[in-house]
Amino acid sequence: MRWCVSIAAILFAGAIAGGDVAGIAAPNPKSQSADTKDTVTSVDVELVIAVDISYSMDMDELAVQREGYAQAIVSREFLQAMKTGPNGKVALTYFEWSASNDQQIIIPWRMIDGPESADAVANEIMKTPVRRGSRTSISGAINFAMPLFDENPYRGLRRVIDISGDGANNSGPPVTGARDAALGKGIIINGLPIMVKEPSYSTMDIDNLDWYYEDCVIGGPGSFVVTIKDRDNFKEAIRTKLILEVADRTPERRAVPVTEKEPRVPCLIGEKIWQDRWGR
């Protein structure tokens, strides 16, 4: 199942007011736990952004990806969507990943509550040199992300992992085990499958990566994917996804997580391709 959604639709007057807009489900009202301590700053969402930097992505794509997140965070649409929540604030951390033991935090937990804090986070994202790593461990990224929520000084109504990637898991534990562990902790996982290149032997890309993400990676209430199929739409797709996440909205025709149906793509396809090719 494939879909697209425009930023204009998300921010159409009725949506910002809290009503339904075609293609977008209105957010469910939520309330904070009564036992939240006064000393803890409340936010609407705790968002972990987990970004793939494997060698299958070229340096230009990695640079555009970085710019996409930085520009999205400072965009008027993102800041407007953020203010639709009861707290009008989000907390986020941003890390890059490749193999099962290769994760680097670029932005530790930061609260965004307006243009000034958004600018500071965006500048921090852009100042770190772009790098690449070997192999692809989505499971490693999820396992790395989970304890970050326990270290977060802010408390949100939702906990979300936003994970991007251009290939299937081929390093570390199976992705479904990591996904299920996160779902067991009440964490939502959304996906940003990157499909701007045709699958090839040299890159270990697979057909229907969007199906793989839908059936093997994402999960939790309202989980969804935004697929990037055109390099020119890279930045808009990133912005659209972040807006949906901070506004607690999902596409009406969303993906149905694998827990509700059989996967259309084998969840161990990445491991099988690696084993067939390298024998280890």
Which ranges hold each PLM region?
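Von Willebrand factor
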Residues: A26, T41-I106, S117-S164, G191-M204, ...
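C-terminal "exit" segments of structured domains
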Residues: V226-R280
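Bacterial N-terminal signal peptides
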Residues: S6-G19
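Sec-exported extracytoplasmic/periplasmic mature domains
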Residues: E67-F78, A99, M126, V130, ...
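Second-shell loop/turn segments in exported
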Residues: A50-D60, L92, P108-W109, E124-R135, ...
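VWA/integrin I-like adhesion module and closely mimicked acidic/polar interface patches used
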Residues: M82, A168-D215
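Acidic, polar low-complexity linker/tail segments
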Residues: G18-V48, S54-A63, L183
